[in-house]
Amino acid sequence: MKAPITRMGGKSKLRKTIIEMIPEHTCYAEIFFGAGWVYFGKEPSKVEIINDIDKELINLFKMIKYHAPEIERQLEFEFSSRDVFEEYKNYNLENLTEINRSIRFLYLISQSFAGKGSTYGYGTTTKPSPQIFYKNVLDEVKKRLRNTYVENLSFEKIIEKYDRPHTFFFCDPPYWKTAGYGNEFGEKEHLLLRDMLKNIKGKFLLTINDHSQVREWYKGFNFKEVRVNYSVSRQEDARGKYGELIITNY
């Protein structure tokens, strides 16, 4: 199934390759969930954990898991509009319920450029994204989330909490020296992640941009080089194929 939202760095182009590389496991833990392309594309594992540090993102999936019909009911009569987008964007989160926060977030992500939630998405060759306004569109997502633990913790806490010999961690951290991610993730965080993955009992697969610094950090692990075509730009010269690495300890 498709992921219900779009996010910066989403794995729609790579998920088939990633899923084919997932080893045998009992517990599946996705540390940087984002849009969840791999999770929504693979067969369910016996135990599954999805996690992201983005509080609003995780609130959305929690609310879909428990209150999907109410989210659909409130979105049914909405439409794609710059005015509505700006109105949602300027809401004070402190005055909203968890359900209303999830509706706001879903609207902003689905109607924004590149799913960043900051700029209203428009075009002359594509239509607005209407799928969130349809009834029962969240049913499949709700069912997929039914037996999944949904966490909103730092990556280090997730690794500490769920690391077992039978655990597989899928890691898709913010890319090195790449702008556009909502949360700060610099060299300190990348090195901490590397150090923790070096010492886990389970297995991991990490996706990241192909950079000499990254190759140095993960020297000694297994590398698979891939080329991915990205088009998240209004400028044609910013589009094209980019090198990425799939790094594993197995």
Model-predicted segments: where are they?
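Short, polar loop motifs at secondary-structure junctions
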Residues: F33-W37, N136-L138, I208-S212
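Short, acidic/turn-prone active-site loops that include or flank metal/cofactor-
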Residues: I53-E56, Y175-W176, R227-S233
